[in-house]
Amino acid sequence: MPNQEKMEKAIYQFLEALGENPDREGLKDTPKRVAKMYIEMFSGLNQDPKEQFTAVFSENHEEVVIVKDIPFYSMCEHHLVPFYGKAHIAYLPNDGRVTGLSKLARAVEVASKRPQLQERLTAQVAQALEDALAPKGIFVMIEAEHMCMTMRGIKKPGSKTITTVARGLYKDDRYERQEILSLIQKG
């Protein structure tokens, strides 16, 4: 569980280390605001993305299910600055086992609300889906802009990083994987 008081003290000291006066008018409530913001932004730390799949149904559906353009934001664990973008999730049900569509978005939400790497985020979403449904195939694609590349260092705003995880049929069958990519890329 996050310790808000400890976070506030650390942020206060950080402002002092910058040469700022944390007690001045514009900054006096900043340690509290920043601590509350980080508690919200890292609220996925004590949650398991797999636990978001609370609704699993047996349906007579054996074709692909795709939810795309799921917006998310996360925090780069290397610099503690945001990266944000869209997640696309596809799965091929096994024995008609499907989940509520919002559960896919909830899994992305939980996995992204922690200090994170995009590669790990992609894998965690795929693993949660695999654990919950054991589908015949899984394909997760995440496209994101990283503020650590936009605001600092190389300073390349607008550049996107794309990560994918393919499992089951979508890993083993190149044709099936290409079909999923085509469906995701359609407007």
UniProtKB/Swiss-Prot annotation:
<keyword id="KW-0342">GTP-binding</keyword>
<keyword id="KW-0554">One-carbon metabolism</keyword>
<dbReference type="GO" id="GO:0046654">
    <property type="term" value="P:tetrahydrofolate biosynthetic process"/>
</dbReference>
<keyword id="KW-0547">Nucleotide-binding</keyword>
<keyword id="KW-0479">Metal-binding</keyword>
<comment type="similarity">
    <text>Belongs to the GTP cyclohydrolase I family.</text>
</comment>
<dbReference type="GO" id="GO:0006730">
    <property type="term" value="P:one-carbon metabolic process"/>
</dbReference>
<dbReference type="Pfam" id="PF01227">
    <property type="entry name" value="GTP_cyclohydroI"/>
</dbReference>
<dbReference type="InterPro" id="IPR043134">
    <property type="entry name" value="GTP-CH-I_N"/>
</dbReference>
<keyword id="KW-0378">Hydrolase</keyword>
<dbReference type="InterPro" id="IPR001474">
    <property type="entry name" value="GTP_CycHdrlase_I"/>
</dbReference>
<dbReference type="InterPro" id="IPR020602">
    <property type="entry name" value="GTP_CycHdrlase_I_dom"/>
</dbReference>
<comment type="subunit">
    <text>Toroid-shaped homodecamer, composed of two pentamers of five dimers.</text>
</comment>
<feature type="binding site">
    <location>
        <position position="148"/>
    </location>
    <ligand>
        <name>Zn(2+)</name>
    </ligand>
</feature>
<dbReference type="InterPro" id="IPR043133">
    <property type="entry name" value="GTP-CH-I_C/QueF"/>
</dbReference>
<dbReference type="GO" id="GO:0003934">
    <property type="term" value="F:GTP cyclohydrolase I activity"/>
</dbReference>
<keyword id="KW-0862">Zinc</keyword>
<dbReference type="GO" id="GO:0005525">
    <property type="term" value="F:GTP binding"/>
</dbReference>
<dbReference type="GO" id="GO:0008270">
    <property type="term" value="F:zinc ion binding"/>
</dbReference>
<dbReference type="InterPro" id="IPR018234">
    <property type="entry name" value="GTP_CycHdrlase_I_CS"/>
</dbReference>
<dbReference type="GO" id="GO:0005737">
    <property type="term" value="C:cytoplasm"/>
</dbReference>
<dbReference type="GO" id="GO:0006729">
    <property type="term" value="P:tetrahydrobiopterin biosynthetic process"/>
</dbReference>
<comment type="pathway">
    <text>Cofactor biosynthesis; 7,8-dihydroneopterin triphosphate biosynthesis; 7,8-dihydroneopterin triphosphate from GTP: step 1/1.</text>
</comment>
<feature type="binding site">
    <location>
        <position position="76"/>
    </location>
    <ligand>
        <name>Zn(2+)</name>
    </ligand>
</feature>
<protein>
    <recommendedName>
        <fullName>GTP cyclohydrolase 1</fullName>
        <ecNumber>3.5.4.16</ecNumber>
    </recommendedName>
</protein>
<feature type="binding site">
    <location>
        <position position="79"/>
    </location>
    <ligand>
        <name>Zn(2+)</name>
    </ligand>
</feature>
